[in-house]
Amino acid sequence: MSVRVSGKHMEIGDSFRVRIGEQIEQAVTKYFDGGYSSQVTVEKSGSRFSADCKLHLDTGVVLQANGQANEPQSAFDAASERIEKRLRRYKRKLKDHHNGNGQNSTEVAYRVMDSVPFEDEEVPDDYAPTIVAETTKQLRTMSVANAVMALDMTDEPVLMFRSPGKDDLNIVYRRNDGNIGWIDAANIKA
């Protein structure tokens, strides 16, 4: 039940720190009765402020949200509203009893790389894409509906998962038009 608050390019006052902690605690206890830890970062960039909020629940679920505004308090309020909305969806998901609590999960490597150049671009001989981040994530077994719900609870652009029964790899992702796309590897012909 810890809330860590930090500021980038700005100082966070004690009253704002207390307000953030109380608001996070209020949102979590409203929808979830387990333990949690949270990291809130408020950043000033130019004349705007952004607040990034990451919430780790005891069930292993990680919820992320961010907000932007002209005032740091307003930016945090926007992020807090999004976190509360995701907590509400998570509670509804738990009530539906569709989640298998991740007991059918596999650990996989997760890499984020720089974009590959197009075929008509000049590519130097020593070109190698830069790996921006490399972590290990759990590859869970879940239905497409649960995968869309899990994608909706985070700000991640892509979620890879295994389909139940067949063990095929599937991907759900956010499309540029705002909709969710689904790639079923079983339907891809080589």
From Swiss-Prot:
InterPro entries: HPF/YfiA_ribosome-assoc, HPF_long/plastid, RHF-like, RHF/RaiA, Ribosom_S30AE_C, Ribosom_S30AE_C_sf. GO terms for molecular function: ribosomal small subunit binding. GO terms for cellular component: cytosolic small ribosomal subunit. GO terms for biological process: negative regulation of translational elongation. It is found in: Cytoplasm. Gene3D superfamilies: Ribosome hibernation promotion factor-like (3.30.160.100), Sigma 54 modulation/S30EA ribosomal protein, C-terminal domain (3.30.505.50). Pfam families: Ribosom_S30AE_C (PF16321), Ribosomal_S30AE (PF02482). Keywords: Cytoplasm, Translation regulation. Required for dimerization of active 70S ribosomes into 100S ribosomes in stationary phase; 100S ribosomes are translationally inactive and sometimes present during exponential growth. PANTHER family: 30S RIBOSOMAL PROTEIN. Belongs to the HPF/YfiA ribosome-associated protein family. Long HPF subfamily. Interacts with 100S ribosomes. This is Ribosome hibernation promotion factor. The lineage of its organism: Bacteria, Pseudomonadati, Pseudomonadota, Alphaproteobacteria, Hyphomicrobiales.
